[in-house]
Amino acid sequence: MNCSDVIRAIGRSPKTFVVAAMALSSAAAAQQPGADFPDGAAKGDVVTICGGCHDINRVKAGYTDEGWRTVMRMMQNFGAPIPPDHVTEITDYLIKSFPEGPRPQAALIEGPVDVAIKEWPVATPGSRPHDPLAARDGSIWYSGQLANVLGRLDPASGEIKEYHVNAQTGPHGLKEDKDGNIWFTGNFAGLIGKLDPKTGHVAEFRMPDPAAKDPHSLVFDQDGILWFTVQQGNKVGRLDPRSGEIKLLTPPTANARPYGIVVNSKNVVFFVEFGAPKVASIDPKTLQIREYPLPDPAARPRRLAIGQGDIVWYSDFARGYLGRLDPATGAVNEWPSPSGPKSQPYGMVFTKGAVWYSESAAKPNTIVRFDPSSEKFQTWAIPGGGDIVRNMDVTPGGEPVMANSLVNKVGLVEVKGGK
């Protein structure tokens, strides 16, 4: 008995089954990852390699030509299985097939404060400075993620000195301890590192769980304990620098993607869940995690800052909002960011009585100041375009500093007026 006989035996026409099978086959093909990508010799590589770590549709968002080159460098540094002789072909395919999409025009709003924005190119081209650090001695540090370097800029002279870390470390977050050591997350290598600037020696603290492969942002609490997020690994970590012991905590929400992290005046740790519409806190003594749901399920908080009265401010990257959470009551207030719902608010700090953040998708990127008293915004265009200010820090004098990833610069915002 052949297949047609079986089909007839259950009371169906072979022709009907053939048509149905063809329809199912076509539907399945349409649902294959990257099925709607433009044809090209590198299409298969893009689907296989990019889709190995990310939702393949992320590629459709597009980048500038230099943005795609930076992405390719990052993937190579991360250890993606890209054949060396395919790099140019893949890069050209991505540039041609997925150019940068429309970006909102920066909304520039005048106000009572004057600023001067200074920028310095970092020493290594294409290093993609990710995070800035304003050190106590007045220097500005940055993590050159794609070059595996930590850089120190003297703003007075413009002199830059870079320190190399191990290959494929992918330095990300930066913090200074009381002794002047620079701590960083090895985002590509599953580690926390400590650089002694006096000697150049780097100590590494490996994650105890291989699933915690991407340490992200970090902060010291008032007891000298280092806390850090692990975004894709869905963890928050606690490292005791005295013993090197690491404890990993798991948020109650699956795929929460812990991202920005800060500590308030009561030594309570707060972090945002970029994969969920939530802010969370950790009791440093009990290690209990409490989550604060945000009112809009589409919210995706990415960075946060502690303001006056321990109010938590956060940047809602997905919706284009600035948010305010009162942890005492759970009350949330929100304000639309000046450049609109697609402006992608990102790196932020609270200083000089105001919230300062950058709109990372506005063209050009902006520095935004929000006065909590008047609830008014003021904005400035970043002179060099910015092109993704992923994080910010504050100098001892209260000036915001930033790292401008895709234009390979670090910046200082000198505040001339206001509080």
Q: Model-flagged regions — what are they?
A:
Residues A29-D45, N77:
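Electrostatic cytochrome c docking/interface patches
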Residues V46-N57, I90, L94:
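The canonical Cys-X-X-Cys-His
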Residues F78-A107, V355, P400:
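C-terminal capping alpha-helices of c-type cytochrome domains
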Residues L108-G126:
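A short helix->beta-strand "capping" segment at the edge of beta-propeller domains
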Residues P125-D137, A167-D179, P210-D223, A254-V268, ...:
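Beta-rich, blade/repeat-based domains predominating
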Residues I140-L146, I182-F188, L226-Q232, V269-G275, ...:
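Conserved beta-strand positions in repeat-built beta-propeller and related beta-rich domains
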Residues D154-G158, D196-G200, D240-G244, D283-L287, ...:
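Short loop/turn segments that connect beta-strands within beta-propeller blades
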Residues D387-K419:
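Blade-level signature of beta-propeller repeat domains, shared across WD40, Kelch, NHL, RCC1
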